[in-house]
Amino acid sequence: LRFDSMEGYSKNATDKMPHSWKAGPQTALLRRQLENMRNGGTVLICPPGNPFRCPPGPYERTSLIAHYLKTHKPKSKIIILDAKEKFSKQSLFMSGWDLHYGDLIEWRAGTAGGKISRVDPQNMQVETEFGMEKGDVINFIPAQHAGKVARDSGLTNKKGWCPVNQVTFE
């Protein structure tokens, strides 16, 4: 994870805005935050821009959180602030969300106010081109790069990833 990829975000910020990308203390923290959130609260989910590991991951997480909220905190909502204009398996997720959760989930593409320019963990808000967005729980997933072994071995490009030929997978 690239903790320096967003203004205002750092390893220290994960205590208030967990990325929860790796299982363990971060996922436990996100769970506690959801349990402690008031009924009627807002969860902001902020996926990273492409590329990143497990492209469906943030949207699978959205589905799990939506199920929890529908069951335990039905007045709450989720806003996905997504820098991307589309995401992996989007039509499947959107139709499932519409069927099971209705207006509980709102997805905002980058050009519709989803692109975040900075985060403010102290005040639990993020800034988009349309202004500040406050969340009771903010799951901010920072930009990513290839693993340490690949980086230390000099296999990565300037963007931090290992180039792959999409035809041959070499």
PLM regions with names:
Residues A23-S76:
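Rossmann-like NAD(P)H-binding beta-loop-alpha module
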